[in-house]
From Swiss-Prot:
Induction: Expression is positively regulated by the dothistromin-specific transcription factors aflR and aflJ. It comes from the Eukaryota. It is found in: Cytoplasm, Cytosol. The gene is adhA. 5'-hydroxyaverantin dehydrogenase; part of the fragmented gene cluster that mediates the biosynthesis of dothistromin (DOTH), a polyketide toxin very similar in structure to the aflatoxin precursor, versicolorin B. The first step of the pathway is the conversion of acetate to norsolorinic acid (NOR) and requires the fatty acid synthase subunits hexA and hexB, as well as the polyketide synthase pksA. PksA combines a hexanoyl starter unit and 7 malonyl-CoA extender units to synthesize the precursor NOR. Coiled coil: none annotated. Its main location: cytoplasm. Belongs to the short-chain dehydrogenases/reductases (SDR) family. One of its GO terms (cellular component) is cytosol. The lineage of its organism: Eukaryota, Fungi, Dikarya, Ascomycota, Pezizomycotina. Pfam families: adh_short. NADP(+) binds at S25, I27, Q48, K52, D73, Y187, K191, V220, T222. Homodimer. Pathway: Mycotoxin biosynthesis. This is 5'-hydroxyaverantin dehydrogenase.
Amino acid sequence: MEALNTNVDLAGLEGRSVLVTGGASGIGLATAKAWAAAGAYVTLADIQPIEKGEKIASDLSHNGQHVNYTFCDVTSWESQLEAFRSAVKFSPRQTLDIVATFAGTAFAPGNEVDHVLFAGEPSLDAELPAPNTKNIEVNLTGVYYSSWLALYFFRLKPSDSSEPGDKSLILVSSIGGYMDSPKASTYPASKFGVRGLFRSTRARTIDIGVRCNLLAPWFVDTPLIAPVKNAMKARGIEMSKVLAFATMEDCVQAASFCAVNKELHGRALAIQPEGTFDLKDDVEDGWAGDQLRPIMKRRREAGFDA
């Protein structure tokens, strides 16, 4: 299985209007910086405190780049709607060209069965609090809202009457959307959900001139995985010693590959420590099974235990 060459010329991003959810931290911020450096008009839509987000945007803008920050809680439809409006208004052509859905929340440990057993013996009189579904609210509902709004605003006609140009929707799932994970339930459920959204939506987006691709990163050393690192450390395990990370650079390159490659549509890209691979998540290639087996074999040989 050969890694893809995801090196692309980012010159095609100049003047393009971009919205990145989760754009003020982690992979989202790294991607946004690369795209802004290439001349794109980038809106960072993030739940980071307004002062922090605006400082990031200001620092980048002082370098001659075009960066806009808007506070955005992706679980709120109204908040996302305002973020998308902000991105369109920030664009010189009053339009939107690329959306990448990097906003996400950390892996919530615990299988559903574990949580049910923790609730104690069943009783009709028990006061049962609702389970924590934040992973699903942020990682799936949030992505669905972003995808919906992207497809809506992509259809705006440019204010200067020019051609709309290429449109790219980049859905961010995880390799956790492709493998069993008995140690958790809500996180893989959310990431499998994004995969399902991708597989249904890609069949139609091309009808309205939108390319749709998916990113499925392996673990990347960002603040988002801090809870997992801490949980492993509490068990006496140093995460970096038993788990090879995918690189931030490979994630940014894969996102950029999706953003500017006008021939790329309907592909799911696994970002691994060894590089980026087309999972071939389609009926012709066994819904990624043939690609996933060697990937997971390498991870288990490297010490990963799902």
